[in-house]
Amino acid sequence: YTTPSGNIHGMPMAASIGEDNKEMSVHELDEKTFKQWEQLKNIGKIYPKVLPEDVVFISLRDFEKEEKHLIEKHGMKVITTAEVRRNGAENVCRKVLRYLSDCTDIYVSFDVDSLDSSISKGTGTPVSNGLREREVEDLISKFMQNRKICCFEITEVNPTLDKENLMAEIAFNILQRSVNILMMN
């Protein structure tokens, strides 16, 4: 309904929280797409997949008005890059874990788009004022020390856009440090 591209994969958070966000609709769905959307929201017979109050975004900088509406409508937590720099990885991690204290399992999805555009060349949507590699490593390593973390993924690495394999190497370094911390726990 709201993704500017019109592609169903442009609304993963909306699908996860079971939200059509029709009040911000920019597309009319044909019957086939509507059925696919409903199937996607109900995959696994779990609906919604996650509660909006259990979502935290870190270093979210560039989003469409439709996404902003969804975040504000549901009061989803957003921590800016400036907050990470001002408060440090340990304090941000502590704040997030305290906010999610009622959750039994925490899924960490690291989108390389959250890195600053000066280093995130191998992704489809690089944006300035993002996190530095070391800041991400510190944040992820702090999260990985918590036993509630049940899954960790790295998304949006696009090798066809990468320059000299830099993005892949950064993602690998972050993954390697995360795995090392998991092995120590």
Positions of the model-derived regions?
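Solvent-exposed alpha-helices and their adjacent loops that cap or buttress functional pockets
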Residues: G6, I46-V50, L100
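Active-site histidine-anchored catalytic micro-motif
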Residues: Y1-Q36, N146-I149
